[in-house]
Amino acid sequence: PSRYPELAALVGESSDNLPGVPGVGPKTAAKWLDAYDGLENLVRHADEVGGKAGESFRAHLDDVVRNRRLNALVGDLELPVSVEELTRRDWNREAVHDLFDGLEFRVLRDRLLETLPAEDLTSEGGFEVEGEVLPTGGVRAWLDAHARAGVVGLDCQGRWRAGAGDLTGVALAAADGAAAWLDVTTLSPDDDAAFAEWLADESAAKAMHDAKGPLLAIWSRGWELGGLASDTQLAAYLLRPDQRVYDLADLTVRHLRRDLSVAAGGADDGDQAAFSFDDTESNDAMVRARAVIDLATALETELEERGGAQLLREVELPLTRTLATMERAGIAVDLDYLHRLHADFDSAVVAAEADAFAVLGRPINLGSPMQLQAVLFDELGMPKTRRTKTGWTTDAESLETLFAKTEHPFLAHLLRHRDQIRLRQTVEGLLKSVADDGRIHTTYVQTIAATGRLSSTDPNLQNIPIRTEEGRRIREAFVVGAAYETLLTADYSQIEMRIMADRSEDDGLIEAFASGQDFHSITASRVFGVPADAVTGAMRAKIKAMNYGLAYGLSAFGLSQQLKIERSEAAGLMEEYFERFGHVRDYLHEIVATARRTGYTETILGRRRYLPDLTSSNRQRREMAERAALNAPIQGSAADVIKVAMLDVEAALARNGLRSRMLLQVHDELVFEVAAGEREQLEALVRDKMGHAVEMRVP
């Protein structure tokens, strides 16, 4: 190892762009260094090295000497710290998590934790657990003895995805300290009935971590889950919505200073192995079940202090069941139509590629940034885009801007090629996701978006384009299933602007909504001082960009870029807007000022987002936090509204005994499958519940 720099000087180092001696590999170089006791002596006796490798070495001697000079470590630098200061010390786990959360270094965090000794991960050891495997016929007795009072922690083992699942075992940890493992694959009829009865009992309080997946598996066994009092994943998310990852092991260390293991002295006899049997899966599951109870208490205490406990109990927890119901239902697709659509997009990709090659007069790899850089900026002489480490960027936004400037036909074909590839990939993802029942069962995630918005994955049904004709063709693949009559969609029109009007109490915006006319046209008529019927398409487009951009911290420069107008015109437009809707400006200023003072923003239902960078000395980080502060209350309130609407609609469907069902949530839109003869009743029900989910000053 001490001679690696000398070896690298001979064979080269690609990371430092140092060329090696042609024909000399690591084995040859190592042999030479051993024979001549180092590079310096090897260079001194270069004439003695034989063979073609020796000739190559002599021909590139200057390169070798230069390489060694360049890769030499500086050894006489004055260090601003002493060796003692570099000694390994205790670390602030909370600060590390906050830093990694902010930087979104999720994989690096996992690697860091893996490298740390166990004693560094916790200061208070593991969990005290005394567990047993429940024998045949012993389920009811154990439940009666331990699970009728207090909260019971559950940890389910099995698999669940695509709207279905299967359980293999369940670990229970009772409030009195007892724990048990239930192998559900070998249950007797009596034990099955006893556990199913307790599991469905609303009066038997239960806590879980990420309950939605196991709920699908519970349903698959014909069981029901009642009395879910806490979900530690959701509670942790509400406390720190920017964290992104809510692993149980990480949360127990962060909030309880304990790791997921059995504490020494966990059993009465002081033995660390506090189990009556030796099975890693079941033992680990019981530890997790015990951890869930303690963690739920800690998180709920903190949520109560921060005003988020009601949001957990009344919105996020019950929404878990609603989302699981939607996932299990899925949505039917026309498989033949999807295959035809894939073939169409594939043909369009090939055609766009051929058109691009025809303009150039030769084929290139349209997916290679390096080749595109050479063609666009060297061969075609186009204006340079933004500089990156690997050259001039060729991302979609930059190429679209470049096309707007040049209107070059090659760029037109390149952009279409990329667009058709994206559409083809979307269809491919849908085709791979069709289950045996002919339906697609997406998975909804409540803990991804810091604003509170739901996410869809496997596949993501929220990223299907709807603003283009081709994107709308993809939506046509979703059809009504057998035994149902039609699909029904209902969405919130301009929900973010309605929230803006409500929260700002701006009379102008409230009146614009109350008029029942096109919102953007009405606001444009006020800004430009013309009657609503005199508003042109260009006027409406400018004000529409303003309306939607305000909640994202839109600046005059950003507006000018978006509308392709001069910055001075954009600044004047914003000034005119705020003169007409002054309370909006006051509200936006107040959002940031309040968040800077309190450290967080808040939605209609009290959903908080903490933004410590609002007081950062780094201007870039501070401005990013300010934009987030503007956006979080609006986006978060929109999330609150549609979540409440989903709960209200689901409850009303059950209360009215309707067979129609809610299938999808896509941003501000809900999709329903309508049972025969229920359309009118469903429309009225959905309109009522969505319209009154949260009372606001606007209709």
Label every PLM stretch briefly:
Residues 203-209, 218-219, 475-500, 511-544:
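Conserved catalytic alpha/beta cores of large enzymes that bind or transform nucleotide phosphates
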Residues 60-186, 243, 270-469, 479-486, ...:
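Conserved "right-hand" nucleotidyltransferase catalytic core of DNA-directed polymerases
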Residues 321, 325-328, 404-407, 432, ...:
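Conserved catalytic core of nucleic-acid polymerases
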Residues 189-193, 368, 677-684:
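Short, conserved charged micro-motifs
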